[in-house]
């Protein structure tokens, strides 16, 4: 807060090797406790992502801890990640969110996410993927570079912004030197690597 940030996202970044799609109750419990304390201490907008692709669990954590959004990978269209095949989760996720009464928890969906192969969807553009997130009732799209710490291409951000009316957040590689390059196309910046030392 003192540094001028508007929000925080909690993520089990170093819980490697990541499980695919589902995590154990100990991860859910830990993320809920951490998230609740971060929200209480900061008073900021707080989101959560549970790797890898544990989107249902992330929504449950956000709901239980009073957080504002869950970041979801594999929301629209499938892809191959480090962990294997990641299916689209939008249908299950939105129904689960409604079932537990968590409608106030926003879903921020990665499009053509980092650390993944998108060969199976090469005929679908980044803009079309963003359109699909909007069609599937996502609340925001997250655009990244190809890996953690690498920024997205400016033209990719512009394409996404031109194809949907959702909040466009940038999810990797943003720092003090390149942040201005992405105005006015980006609405939010998730800054992690730039603030860390040796990855922590």
Over which residues does each language-model region extend?
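Active-site mouth loops of central-metabolism enzymes
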Residues: 1, 45-54, 109-127, 170, ...
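Conserved anion-binding
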Residues: 63-140
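Glycine-rich, proline-tolerant flexible connector loops at the mouths of alpha/beta enzymes
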Residues: 7-30, 76-82, 138-152, 196-200
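Alpha-helix-loop-beta-strand connector modules within alpha/beta enzyme cores
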Residues: 19-48, 88-109, 152-175
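Hydrophobic faces of well-ordered beta-strands that scaffold small-molecule active sites
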Residues: 8-10, 46-50, 70-72, 105-111, ...
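Glycine/small-residue-rich loop that forms an oxyanion/phosphate-binding "nest" at active or ligand-binding sites
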Residues: 31-79, 85
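C-terminal helical cap(s) of enzyme catalytic domains, especially alpha/beta-barrels
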Residues: 84-92, 157, 161, 188-200
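Catalytic cores of alpha/beta
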Residues: 53-66, 129, 160-166, 170-191
């Amino acid at each position: 807060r003192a540094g001028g940030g508007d929000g925080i996202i909690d993520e089990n970044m170093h819980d490697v090797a990541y499980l695919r799609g589902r995590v154990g109750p100990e991860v859910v419990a830990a993320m809920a406790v951490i998230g609740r304390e971060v929200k209480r201490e900061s008073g900021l907008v707080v989101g959560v992502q549970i790797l890898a692709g544990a989107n249902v669990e992330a929504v449950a954590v956000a709901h239980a801890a009073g957080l504002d959004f869950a970041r979801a990978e594999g929301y629209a269209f499938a892809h191959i990640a480090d962990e294997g095949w990641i299916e689209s989760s939008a249908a299950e996720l939105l129904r689960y969110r409604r079932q537990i009464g968590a409608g106030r928890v926003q879903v921020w969906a990665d499009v053509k996410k980092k650390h993944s192969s998108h060969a199976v969807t090469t005929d679908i553009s980044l803009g079309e993927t963003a359109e699909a997130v909007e069609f599937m009732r996502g609340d925001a799209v997250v655009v990244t570079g190809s890996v953690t710490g690498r920024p997205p291409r400016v033209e990719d951000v512009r394409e996404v912004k031109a194809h949907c009316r959702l909040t466009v957040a940038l999810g990797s590689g943003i720092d003090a030197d390149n942040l201005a390059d992405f105005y006015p196309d980006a609405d939010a910046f998730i800054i992690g690597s730039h603030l860390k030392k040796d990855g922590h």
